[in-house]
Amino acid sequence: MENLGKVFREFRISKNYSLKEAAGEACSTSQLSRFELGESDLAASRFFEILDNIHVTIENFMDKTRNFQHHEHVSLMAQIIPLYYSNDIAGFQKLQEEQLEKAKSSTNPLYFELNWILLQGLICQRDASFTMKQDDLDKVADYLFQTDEWTMFELILFGNLYSFYDVDYVARLGREVMEREDFYKEIGRHRKLVLILALNCYQHCLEHLAFENASYFEAYIEKIIGKSIKLYERNVFHFLKGFALYQKGQKEEGCKQMQEAMHIFDVLGLPEQVAYYQEHYDKFVKD
């Protein structure tokens, strides 16, 4: 709810309305001020009334709210990516502390709690001495199940925590996302996230020898990549198809294809990707 208050304040100030004018008969100026600061909520009827007072439609308001949330997600991910590739556990833990502090002062702490769990998952991926709690994984699963309209946040959440879940669950949830293609293809950024999620689901299925589910994601990736130039994603797919060959018993050909993909990442000047896929190769390829 505090996001709604912040967005409302931006609209009010940009339109040069005072607190008193915006509050009108709907609430007191102190109530509106607390709402803008995220310290309290407003009843739906009062909320719609204050929107009318500053002449903003609910459609325009919600568009701006989604953009506001999008910028929060992007800001967090911009901090996460360098920490992940540098194995900076202390940096992750600092971000976790910040999310906990935000949760404590928030009227809707779930968003920050889920961010904390996301960060814990990334810590566990980089350092095996850390573990995920089942309660945290259940909280994420419950949230995703109850959310009908996925945004960037849900795609990022599932896309980074999928490896902690049973392969059948990942395949089922992944299929549900893929089958909503018409929704995502209108939103370029979301479509790229869906492609990355499909690659992740494909990898997870192959790691667990779930070839029937893997074939579904392979076909989906072939379709969504099409003839477009997505060099990074194409090369990840090239590696994973090599991994599929290896897992199905064509070991020599599979190893050759995975090594080709790692060489391409090296030529492209992407040492972090080389290291990641070399680590994956070493984990699964047995002499």
Which residues does each PLM region occupy?
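"A position-specific structural signal for the A-helix of alpha-solenoid helical repeats
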Residues: V7, A78, F112-I123, I156, ...
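Amphipathic alpha-helical segments of tetratricopeptide repeats
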Residues: E97-K104, D138-Q146, M178-K185, E218-K227, ...
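Helix-turn-helix repeat elements of alpha-solenoid scaffolds
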Residues: Y85-E98, S129-D138, V167-E179, H208-A219, ...
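DNA major-groove recognition helix of helix-turn-helix/homeodomain DNA-binding modules
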Residues: S45-N60
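Short, charged recognition helix plus adjacent turn
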Residues: D63-A90, H263, V267
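A short, Lys/Arg-rich alpha-helix, primarily the initiator
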Residues: M1-S14
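Short alpha-helical DNA-recognition segment
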Residues: N16-S33
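Alpha-helical adaptor scaffolds
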Residues: E154-L231
